[in-house]
Amino acid sequence: MVGVAKYRHLPHGRSNGMLADDLWLSQGDVDHCGVDLRPRAVEIAQSRAEKAGAAVRFAVLQALTEELPSGFDIVMCSLFLHHLNREEAVTLLAKMATTARHMVLVNDLVRSRRGLILAHLAARLLTVSSVVWVDAPRSVRTAFTIDEVQELALAAGLAGVTVSRRWPCRMLLEWKRP
């Protein structure tokens, strides 16, 4: 993935642990440590990993106020950035860049009219949960635009960052250590 035979991967905010489990199962020579600020989420993720036979570790951590674990080649977060304000997003991105030996990856929603329409439609078509009906559009409204994410990354010191659109209404931030 980043030109090393064995690498260490630190996903943040993936409360159910599915991403770390899936990566471990598809790529056995990877050291994964997932973090989340909620102890119950970490407990569920660890239990899930153990049942799947995945050698994945999880830790309770508040990434905005605590030091991230060191020594990871790739540090990533998925569907987490839109929960933060601008200052928090810059703080998180800077901490991720400091921690990552090789790469930072951020996958998140993009704030757009199209995304808002899709969130409304998908929430109504795919679930009967009134919580999802409210939360999906709210998440899109609090997300950043592509240009805003680019600005946040540069403010965090991620020179050379690329931010690209992904289907359906997502973005991928990629930064490689020079």
Residue ranges: model-predicted function:
Residues 84-96:
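A short, conserved alpha-helix within the catalytic core of class I
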Residues 161-178:
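Core SAM-dependent methyltransferase catalytic element
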Residues 1-8:
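Conserved alpha-helix/loop element of class I SAM-dependent methyltransferases that forms part
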Residues 80:
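Hydrophobic adenine-recognition pocket in adenosine-nucleotide-binding enzymes
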Residues 100-109:
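Conserved beta-strand signature within the Rossmann-like core of class I S-adenosyl-L-methionine
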Residues 109-158, 162:
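C-terminal alpha-helical "lid/dimerization" subdomain adjacent to the S-adenosyl-L-methionine
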Residues 76:
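A conserved beta-strand element that flanks and buttresses the S-adenosyl-L-methionine
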Residues 8-65:
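Class I SAM-dependent methyltransferase SAM/SAH-binding core
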